[in-house]
Curated annotation (Swiss-Prot):
This is Ubiquinone biosynthesis protein COQ4, mitochondrial. GO terms for cellular component: extrinsic component of mitochondrial inner membrane. HAMAP family: Coq4. It comes from Coccidioides posadasii (strain C735) (Valley fever fungus). Lyase that catalyzes the C1-decarboxylation of 4-hydroxy-3-methoxy-5-(all-trans-polyprenyl)benzoic acid into 2-methoxy-6-(all-trans-polyprenyl)phenol during ubiquinone biosynthesis. The keyword Transit peptide applies. Zn(2+) binds at H166, D167, H170, E182. The gene is COQ4. It is an enzyme of class 4 (lyase). It is found in: Mitochondrion inner membrane. Its main location: mitochondrion. GO terms for biological process: ubiquinone biosynthetic process.
Length: 283
């Protein structure tokens, strides 16, 4: 009996030793000083602790400075896994156009899109709307950083695609890149994509001026919820094939409601303030 107990104890001890060795082996396989090979060019594998720390630090930094696009991009990547980016990928796999996009892997840059050509399209087209929006806002499709922190190679492309399509969302909604406009668009994107970063961006509204907050809560947030939920999955739009289409026709097809022109609203507010100031001076 004593011998049997001794044998069982030794067996348990050996199993525990094997588990401990396996855990140490895994730790050696993936640690700060010993990372696995990247899954695609530019990929940086992260441990769960590193991912969490990077997500929190980037979220705080982007909240303090909403113009830090690099921090916002990092928050997007580190909070999209393990569930949300797979949900978006699965939405593409469930759609015929989404599957084509995943197969073709198109990229949106100034090399893949001829901006001079788009500027000469009829004014009611998607391409003209996109190009003139870029010109008005002074931005370029080449400013989108490459995905680094998503482990799955296909999901990394999905995030890259979302990132490069962001300016098309701006163009068809007409929202400018001022902080107020970015927050409104991020709220719209959250309702449409469920990417956590887009929802977290709404907290940046606390840094808006009082009149901007009032507009956001009363006009643009209700619009974002309403339109974001009603519209089709925008990740499945093959924008490169829509450039010559009527932009209003595409909005109707995608069920996108265009919000009130934010630049026009801000301009009128400035003019009213200027007129009121001049009236005080004259009096």
């Amino acid at each position: 009996m004593a011998i049997a107990k001794s044998v069982r104890a030794r067996a348990v001890g050996l199993r525990s030793l094997r588990v401990l060795c396996a855990q140490r082996s895994v730790a050696r396989e993936f640690s700060v000083l010993n990372r696995p090979q990247p899954n695609y060019p530019g990929h940086i594998p992260l441990t769960p602790i590193e991912r969490g720390a990077l997500a929190i630090g980037s979220a705080v930094g982007s909240l303090l400075n909403p113009r830090r696009g690099d921090l916002i991009a990092t928050v997007g990547e580190t909070t999209a896994t393990p569930f949300f980016i797979y949900r978006l990928r699965d939405a593409m796999l469930a759609d015929s156009t989404g599957r084509r996009i995943l197969r073709d892997r198109p990229r949106i840059t100034s090399q893949t899109l001829s901006l001079p050509y788009l500027r000469n399209l009829p004014k009611n087209t998607v391409g003209y709307t996109y190009a003139t929006w870029l010109d008005r806002e002074g931005v370029s499709p080449d400013t989108r950083s490459s995905v680094q922190y998503i482990d799955d190679e296909e999901c990394a492309y999905v995030m890259q695609r979302y990132r490069e399509c962001h300016d098309f969302y701006h163009a068809v909604t007409g929202l400018p890149i001022v902080v107020e406009g970015e927050i409104a668009l991020k709220a719209f994107e959250f309702m449409n994509t469920l990417i956590p970063m887009t929802g977290l961006s709404v907290f940046a509204a606390i840094r808006l001026k009082p009149e901007e907050k009032q507009r956001f809560w009363s006009i643009h947030l209700p619009w974002a919820i309403r339109s974001g939920l009603a519209s089709k999955e925008l990740i499945n739009v093959y924008w490169e094939e829509q450039l010559e289409r009527d932009v209003n026709e595409l909005r109707e097809e995608l069920n996108i409601e265009k919000p009130p022109d934010l630049r026009d609203i801000r301009k009128k507010v400035r003019e009213q303030k200027k007129a009121a100031k001049e009236a005080v001076i004259k009096s």
